[in-house]
Amino acid sequence: MAYSSKPWGYVIYRTTYTPESTSLWPRAIDTINTYVAHFTLETLTEQNKESSYEEIISRLENIPIQDPTLDGATYDELRVHFASWLQTQDRRGESGDRDLPRARFRTFLVIDQAALEMIANAPNPADEGADPRAVSRPCLTAVAAQHHEGRRLRPTRSARGPRDVNEGQLFPGWMKVPIFTLHELWEANSERLDLIELCPSDFVDEPVWEP
């Protein structure tokens, strides 16, 4: 897994402020951290690197952002807020490099009411007998911090077929991400891959990332 010695984790926006959401929000954040920790350990174990788990997970730092003025905010409105937030975080180390991990500049996460309810009520993946389908179902939205309308995804097609820059679907600037894959999304972002390079091109209603 691609981790530097810096803190890692995403900025997570809350865009619903109903009375019910106030109690669900901290549960949802706890659930996300639980899932990231559980599946990070699972991946490290598969790679025979579980000895590094404690050090890696100690640097996990998802950053929840709550602001009632963002109730129902659009992705473009969140991009403006995110850009302003980054300006307050743009510290530089002794080498002159940014202290923030690169992946945190490229993508942020959004939780609306539907996602909030699903995540807050998700089962603990470590529980014996947890339904795998229930574990894999909760999703949130990953949003590209910078998005230019009109960019297209690479079409899924035979390499021998004719190429046309206008053949791929338009990239919406976001995709749904199951929370059990967030550690893999971070790794992909850390390897200099933007959402447009990760977003599936064969979606019908909405893109859902599958690593």
Predicted regions and their residues:
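Extended, charge-biased low-complexity segments
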Residues: 1-172
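Acidic, proline/glycine-rich low-complexity IDRs
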Residues: 151-211
